[in-house]
Amino acid sequence: MEAVVNLYQEVMKHADPRIQGYPLMGSPLLMTSILLTYVYFVLSLGPRIMANRKPFQLRGFMIVYNFSLVALSLYIVYEFLMSGWLSTYTWRCDPVDYSNSPEALRMVRVAWLFLFSKFIELMDTVIFILRKKDGQVTFLHVFHHSVLPWSWWWGVKIAPGGMGSFHAMINSSVHVIMYLYYGLSAFGPVAQPYLWWKKHMTAIQLIQFVLVSLHISQYYFMSSCNYQYPVIIHLIWMYGTIFFMLFSNFWYHSYTKGKRLPRALQQNGAPGIAKVKAN
């Protein structure tokens, strides 16, 4: 326990003071409590509450929710591009800019906004529970939805920006497509003729992980790179690689071996892809 406390204190010494005033960023206790409550609700409390109740329909809510996340994800992508990726970043070795320049502060804001969006997306699983779609609450889904915001919190706390933010930008780009699909599918059968591209959604996920891994792997082949926290590079590489393997396994068993769209790929009552988003 003493070692954990010492590690925590050491990490917090490197906290970026520019992020201190943002919601959830003062201490990891609040966000950890939220995530633990989420895990408890979706794995235990929620199913017990709904056990003897009829499933909620929630169609109107899901339409608004999904299209709101389309808009939010689009905005996040735009802000990442305008705060470095389309201006000063080289797309190779890009250290975090800790200055108070307008562009650097803009990057801090969008890094936090991406983190906050991960907490909003916890509602994905809550919707599953309220609609009694318990089969969609897989280990991969819950693991991803809980671990990503927890780990990203630490990244935003000490290194909001730089080459470590590439995967967040790519993830938000993918979410534009994903939530567009989910929003349309929430309309029911009337929208099904326009959702022919659902079969490509898992492939888009896999491409996302390939892009993230390729980008971050550049670090290992550079003669020098002054990115401030190499541990973040290592974690992103591990994250991209592990989830590529998990999604590949999912693809194999669902599409190649099974020759079918698995039940776990359905959201809003329509065929889709597993709600186990990346990054």
Curated annotation (Swiss-Prot):
Its EC number is 2.3.1.199. Ubiquitous. It is linked to Ichthyotic keratoderma, spasticity, hypomyelination, and dysmorphic facies: An autosomal dominant disease characterized by ichthyosis due to epidermal hyperproliferation and increased keratinisation, hypomyelination of the central white matter, spastic paraplegia, central nystagmus, optic atrophy, reduction of peripheral vision and visual acuity, and dysmorphic facial features. Keywords: Acetylation, Disease variant, Endoplasmic reticulum, Fatty acid biosynthesis, Fatty acid metabolism, Ichthyosis, Lipid biosynthesis, Lipid metabolism, Membrane, Transferase, Transmembrane, Transmembrane helix. It is a multi-pass membrane protein. The modification N-acetylmethionine is found at residue 1. It is an enzyme of class 2 (transferase). A motif (Di-lysine motif) lies at residues 275-279. GO terms for biological process: alpha-linolenic acid metabolic process; ceramide biosynthetic process; establishment of skin barrier; fatty acid elongation, monounsaturated fatty acid; fatty acid elongation, polyunsaturated fatty acid; fatty acid elongation, saturated fatty acid; linoleic acid metabolic process; long-chain fatty-acyl-CoA biosynthetic process. It is found in: Endoplasmic reticulum membrane. Interacts with LASS2 and HSD17B12. Interacts with TECR. The C-terminal di-lysine motif may confer endoplasmic reticulum localization. Catalyzes the first and rate-limiting reaction of the four reactions that constitute the long-chain fatty acids elongation cycle. This endoplasmic reticulum-bound enzymatic process allows the addition of 2 carbons to the chain of long- and very long-chain fatty acids (VLCFAs) per cycle. Condensing enzyme that exhibits activity toward saturated and monounsaturated acyl-CoA substrates, with the highest activity towards C22:0 acyl-CoA. HAMAP family: VLCF_elongase_1. The chain crosses the membrane at residues 23-43, 61-81, 110-130, 137-154, 176-196, 201-221, 231-251. One of its GO terms (cellular component) is endoplasmic reticulum. It comes from Homo sapiens. Pathway: Lipid metabolism; fatty acid biosynthesis. This is Very long chain fatty acid elongase 1. It catalyses: a very-long-chain acyl-CoA + malonyl-CoA + H(+) = a very-long-chain 3-oxoacyl-CoA + CO2 + CoA; eicosanoyl-CoA + malonyl-CoA + H(+) = 3-oxodocosanoyl-CoA + CO2 + CoA; (11Z)-eicosenoyl-CoA + malonyl-CoA + H(+) = 3-oxo-(13Z)-docosenoyl-CoA + CO2 + CoA; docosanoyl-CoA + malonyl-CoA + H(+) = 3-oxotetracosanoyl-CoA + CO2 + CoA. PROSITE patterns: ELO. GO terms for molecular function: fatty acid elongase activity. The gene is ELOVL1. Belongs to the ELO family. ELOVL1 subfamily.
